[in-house]
């Protein structure tokens, strides 16, 4: 499948297996889901997970279990990642680990923008994040 993220960024969605339920024909349930985002600056982001859902109408992608994402520099690992084309945001949550050229961090939830490389970090229950910055 092909879709658009943020109205002008193309992406492709694929999987090993997929099925559609009659009661919700716009949602495709996938096994070994793989999305490739093509960013304006030429970078390519690969997002993979053991399970996931793709909405053909909204282009939203929901990844579950063993989520891995990378743009070649930044690497993200988590249990869940929601690529919300309808909101122009990536929500990453549950056991999030993010490594990037100048450091690494662990958190419960990160809202990440692949285009700008900005992220907002939060913890459930007001706990502190664990972050390491390398100069």
What is each of the regions a protein language model found here?
Residues 1-135:
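Mature-chain termini and adjacent capping regions
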């Amino acid at each position: 499948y092909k879709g658009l993220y943020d109205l002008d960024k193309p992406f492709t969605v694929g999987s090993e297996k997929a099925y559609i339920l009659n009661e919700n024909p716009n949602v495709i349930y996938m096994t070994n889901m793989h999305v490739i985002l093509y960013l304006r600056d030429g970078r390519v982001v690969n997002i993979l997970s053991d399970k996931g859902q793709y909405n053909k109408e909204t282009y939203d992608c929901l990844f579950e279990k063993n989520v891995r994402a990378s743009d070649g520099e930044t690497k993200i690992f988590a249990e869940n990642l929601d690529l919300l084309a309808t909101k122009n945001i990536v929500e990453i949550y549950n056991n999030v680990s993010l490594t990037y050229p100048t450091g690494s961090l662990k958190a419960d939830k990160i809202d990440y923008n692949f285009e700008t490389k900005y992220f907002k970090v939060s913890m459930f229950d007001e706990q502190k994040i664990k972050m390491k910055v390398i100069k």
